Every structure is written in structure tokens, then in C-alpha cells.
Amino acid sequence: MNGEPFRAGERVVLLDERGRRFLVRLEGGGTFHYHGGALPHDLVLGSEEGTTVHSTTGASLLCFRPRLADFVLKMGRGAQVIYPKDLGPILISADVFPGARVLEAGTGSGALTLALCRAVGPEGRVVSYERRAEFLEVARGNAQDFFGKVPAWLDLRDGDVREVAGTGETFQRVLLDLPEPWAVLDEVGAVLGPGGILCTYLPTTGQVQEAVAAMRDARFAEVETFEVLLRTWHVAPRSVRPDHRMVAHTGFITVGRKTA
């Protein structure tokens, strides 16, 4: 879609003069109302990315297609999401590659699911388990909203991830966003191939201690835990300093590799 004009039915990020972002679905004849006035959708439809449009009060808005990070922060939620600052490091530390077979547990609202689907691409496969049907439907809707349709390589399953042990499937990567990942380690470890990577996402140190102990008992190697602290900077001609606010702790990321 990059390089093509905006069309009805797709999403646009509208960026105001103060850097505030608004995620809007474009409809012919529709209108976006906000504190800066009203913006007819028809002013955006047919225009290119990076175009500046003006509301009824003359306020300027820049038009861009949403990044995954924009979508994750604005999408529908059933459960708390993994934030963009953690999604990138998870994909890199778990070495999620195009064509990979990935097992996820704890779909939630689908933020990590979307990132995994885009990372593995059509040649890969993402199987995602969620025990709460209402969360799974939110994730399904978000996948359809972001990709235009639910990707053919995404398999959303209503149930306990331990059920995967009886399917005969094997995976190269396993990612667990569960409060007690150690409780499913035997089953997910059985379907993870030798050299495969297991990644957990947990909010507290107590949970991390128990998860790491279980991974070491199961003979996982290179077990490592880290967190990501994001600090943006204010850069001006006469001043360069950290911004007054930063995004600190959101969760601990633990990775380990399965041995033969």
C-alpha cells in the first residue's frame, strides 16, 4: 500500500501540530471530529502519504499510514497489551525470522501476535492459544483490522496451550505471555525443536525467578533476562536533553535455548 493514495476502508494516522496522533478509518462522506474542529474524510481520500490537510478551523493535520506501533497503541483491547518498546526486542532476542514456525500462548488483544505474523510472513506459521474466548475475538478483529483480513498463516485457538502436545506439531520458537509459564513448560518444551528458542514475558521478579528456575531444570541453555527502558530526548538548536517523562518498567523478557 505504500506509495498508493489513501482509499476508503483503510486506516490513517492524523498527526496534529503538537504531535498528537489520531487513528481513523476512512469512509467516503465521513467526518473526523476532534478538538481542532472537523475534518471531512474526502480531503484525505485520494491523497498521498505525507499530505497536509486542514480542519474546518484551519488546523493542520499530517496524513500517514499507521505503523504497527501506532496501531498497537490505539487498537481494541480485551487484555493488556505488550507495548511497542518490548515487541521489537522480543522479536530480536527470540530470533523470529521469515518462514519460522512459532507457537504463542496468551494471545490477549493480539499485539505480539500481529508482530509475529508480520515477522514470519506468508511462508511461516503462527499458532496462538488463548483461554478466554472474548480476548481471542478481540485479537481476531485486530488482526483483520491491521492486515485487511486474518492472515492465512495465523491459527488462533481457543484453549490451553498444553493441548498442543497431542497435535504432532513442532515449532522453532515459543513465546509465552502467561502468568505461570513454568506450568506449561513440559508440554511446550516437547514441541520445541532442539536449538529452538523459548521466550517469556512477565511483570514481576518473583515470576521471573520461578520461570528461570524451571527453564534451567529443563536444561535450557543461554537463559537470559532483561527489561527495556525507553527514554526519548528533546533536541532543539540550543538545547539537547532527556524528555521529562520516560517509559520505564513494563515487563521482564526471558529467553533460553532448548538443548538436545
Q: What are the roles of these predicted feature ranges?
A:
Residues 1-65:
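N-terminal auxiliary segments of SAM/dcSAM-dependent transferases
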Residues 3-4, 74-87:
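Conserved SAM-binding loop and adjacent beta-strand
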Residues 97-108:
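Conserved class I S-adenosyl-L-methionine
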Residues 109-122, 190:
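Conserved SAM-binding loop of SAM-dependent methyltransferases across substrates and taxa
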Residues 123-127:
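Short beta-strand element of Class I
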Residues 129-176, 181:
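S-adenosyl-L-methionine
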